[in-house]
Regions:
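Alpha-helical membrane segments in multi-pass integral membrane proteins
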Residues: 119-126, 149
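Juxtamembrane boundary at the C-terminal end of a transmembrane helix
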Residues: 161-171
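Interfacial loop-to-transmembrane junctions
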Residues: 129-155
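Hydrophobic, small-residue-rich transmembrane alpha-helices and their short perimembrane loops
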Residues: 1-102, 116, 121-122, 156
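Structural signal for membrane-spanning alpha-helices in multi-pass inner-membrane proteins
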Residues: 103, 107, 130-135, 160
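Membrane interface segments of multi-pass transport proteins and intramembrane proteases
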Residues: 108-114
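Single-residue recognition of alpha-helix boundary sites
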Residues: 33-34, 67, 74-75, 107, ...
Length: 171
């Protein structure tokens, strides 16, 4: 029984860690890329990114907890097993905050045009590494999973850049 509980804890942890980290990286770098390319001042880019991270981390953490809780209620009614809702929410929140700051860091130290390149490059590298880590934890193909996660993140960045270019407020 203890082994089953450990597997459930591990499953909740992996699911929420990967989801929070991937969603935070993709959302944050997509948003920052879009507003940076639109000519937004660097201080606004940083402020927007930080607000996004904490609002989304809380939202995702709560959504994870509520989702896990609903699943737990269903499983109890159908005698499927136990889940740990609060753990999932906490892991989601923490991974979202930690990984969300990765795309912001370049904007703290360099001007916006260079920061945009660094932010996108670093985020894509981290997405690839996260895909590989996720594949390793789940026992699937490392390279394939890394590439898929990188391509999906790249698509979000492209959307942010396209919208930011279209709405360009800087001139």
């Amino acid at each position: 029984m203890a082994e089953v509980q450990k597997q459930k804890l591990t499953s909740v942890f992996i699911r929420n860690f990967v989801f929070g980290a991937e969603d935070s990286l993709v959302s944050t770098v997509g948003l920052l890329s879009g507003i940076a390319i639109a000519g937004t001042p660097r201080s606004y880019i940083v402020l927007t990114g930080i607000v996004l991270i904490f609002v989304e981390a809380f939202s995702m953490g709560v959504a994870s907890e509520l989702s896990e809780h609903s699943t737990e209620e269903y499983e109890q009614r159908h005698e499927v097993g136990e889940r740990i809702p609060m753990l999932g929410g906490l892991v989601m929140f923490v991974s979202y905050v930690v990984f969300g700051f990765i795309p912001i860091i370049p904007y703290l130290f360099t001007e916006s045009a260079a920061a945009l390149r660094y932010s996108v490059s670093i985020s894509l590298i981290v997405l690839f590494a996260l895909g590989v880590l996720s594949a390793r934890l789940s026992g699937t193909k490392l390279l394939r999973h890394g590439i898929v996660m990188t391509v999906m993140g790249g698509a979000a960045i492209a959307i942010g850049v396209a919208i930011g270019s279209f709405i360009n407020i800087g001139g």
